[in-house]
Amino acid sequence: MPSAVATVVGMNDMTTLHDAIGDFPRRKAQTLRFSCGAPRSATAIGDGSRVLFLRSDGPEDLVTSLWLSVFDADGTHREVLLADPRVLLADADDEDVPAEEKARRERAREGGSGIVSYSVDAAGRRVVFTINGQLFLTEIAEDGSGRTRMLAADGIAAGEGATPVLNPRISPDGRHVAYTTGEHLMLVDIAPQWPSGSRHDDATDDDCDGQLPPHAHGHRCGDEESGAPYDPSADKLSTLWSVYPDDDADENTWKIGLAEFVAGEEMDRYDGFWWGPDSRHIIFETFNAAPEPMWYISDPANPQTPASGRRYARALTSNADVRLTLAELAYDGHDEYAGLGIQQISWNRKDYEYVAAVHWSADHEPLLLVQNRRQTRDQVLSVHLGSEASAGSAPVGSTTVLEEHANDQWLDIIQGTPAFTPDGRLVCALNDMDADTNRLTVDGRPFTPAGWQVREVLDVTDEDVLAVVQRTPELDGYEAPDGLSPWRGNADGHDARSFDVVSFDYDGNVLPMTARPGSWSASRRGEGLVVSGRDMDSAKSVMSHSFTMRPVDGGAVPENDGDGSAAMSTLVCPIDNHAAEPGFAPNVRFARLGEHRLYTAIIAPSADSPYAKADRLPVLLKPYGGPGFQQVVFNQAYYWDAQWWADQGFLVVTADGRGTTGRGPRWDREIFENMKDVTLADQVEAVHALAQAVEELNRGTAQDGDASRIPAPDLDKVCMIGWSYGGFLSALAVLDAPDVVKAACAGAPPTDWTLYDTHYTERYLGLDPAAYERNSIIADAPKLARPLMLIHGFADDNVTIAHSLRLSQALMAAGRPHTFLPLTGITHMTNDPVVAENLLTLQRDFLRDALDL
């Protein structure tokens, strides 16, 4: 089972472990949590011998570039810089990001700059992305080199309504790019000839402003019909479709091509339009946010700045009105846009208002996953594309129900499902309550084994499904066939704490793609696989490109000399990581605590800490503790903050209670309509079981001088810190369990669940207002008898500062002293490096004073 004792790692300029840990807050802030310089966002392309990825130049460089990992025909591996934002734009370091793009990045928790996302065509030859609102195209040559230019630069700059450029997606054939401005869905026809200069200016008509009548089909700015001659080196910009810009004089509540707020925040669906595999069809979303309440985010430190208003899907109120439209594009002889036909996609929107997923694979009709408001029922729908004139055929845009699912509490969304296999079988997710397993089905038949919790589907073929899974060993009845032993006897380390990439065939056989327990994901194409993630052994994230190379002209295939992270591949090469390291490995032990056998991490002071040989230490509980997210995982980065806290003189404990996923659908649903009581009870259970667990971990170690010995917990001095749900749990602990938790720091706590969004909150609390009253903590304010610090950002549009303000107001009304740190300009991500650094020390000093340390 992975564990670690704190040691000095990778810090040539620091001679002691104590120095490295002491400098951690500053270095964490400077390096964007040690992520700068690390490769990320990998996509295998072509035959799998190539992988696209993003990476900045160094440990403090926020500007990410586009790179290519290449295996040449002789097996040589190279990394090729395809597009550098600083070369393409002089002001790449000074980002001017549109408000809509900032919102998308906030939903995706994106903290970088430069090229932060990209779209690639089916052949892996063309890639599009934005930098500072400008649209760029990179073409990849046979030798792996690339050339990059702006697309439709003058047309986008000059056309009214053509900006901002949001979510550009290249067509599968690589000839067109669609993007949205929020009000217009735009199309760029890529010139077949590369312009002579690095920047190409698109010709436009002076009288063409890019505007369209509401919901009228588009036309080209500067097209041939207006007299402009065809130019094979000129990109053409067209408006495909627009939403109503004049519904409201002050606010356009209609949006096109964007995902509504709850889709991005809670469903992990960030796209609002989808190309068809034939590059002639597009499904696009339009939504009207007018039914949602209007909320305002203000900046009190700058009273001259007006408050920013936006619609917010508040729990127990109305959602946005979401619609889908199918567009069929026509092209002329030059493969340039010549018009379109559209048809609304019809389904039972009244009963199934959430569009959870859209998936469209080659040679098949598009698939939709729609949910009812309570998320207790869903439908998998196919969208009909055929001609209305065909005898007996269903109308274009109509849908057919392929599968339906139900659950008394809620249904989980498993990313990557539903999906067709190439030969037409339907792969769906199943919350199998009888087997207590989140499984996959093919044409309605479960085929993944019991005890293997599927978290995400990465790829679907006729032979297998590539997926991210967590094992529940106590449920796992799977017996590997002869010659196939998952993890070769290392299965005990692969449990709820490990996110493993495996291949399932449709008979339920399992082939692991990752060898070490950790937090892994992957992308697969052809004979290539790129695996990325973290484990407990390395401070840096790992990205490994593997490719099965066939012998050429009788030559031998090189032997696999990799680390086993992609066991079935022949060639394996790591992708360089230029990130900084914190300079220490955390001193963490893992245990199972209490009646519920809670997965728990216990982090003790490092060997250099003055507290290393203490007999006993105060306890710092550091949970998330809420539904849908785990913190006790085999990922070293999860424990760096905890190690800093341990070296301040605390025994740090993180326990994953009921609802935190990874242990089956029953475990997840034990919090239903009772999050408050259940999640707090599990933290209290962990405290009560802690002393015995530490005794057992120390059994066999010397009492003095042994670095592996853990100081005993001082259960009279227990405190808690947390952010988001962890902040809620921290405030709740000093309100409802003051005999156990004696002080708390609560960051961005959702104190009143009626102020949080629909999709998340109603999944766990349902639609009964009484459940919200029971699970909120405002009414508990008069019970406060322990020190409490509230921390909240004014710019937080996810958990708004109203949560902390309402609790503070109730505490004031009850005469209960407390501390409140309002953060100007800070969102839910705490993205200011100075604030992030100082928050740690301010919380430390508060807790030391509160516990009289």
Each model region followed by its residue ranges:
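Non-catalytic accessory segments flanking enzyme active sites
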Residues: 41, 63, 116-117, 128, ...
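Conserved alpha/beta-hydrolase "acid-adjacent" motif
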Residues: 798-806
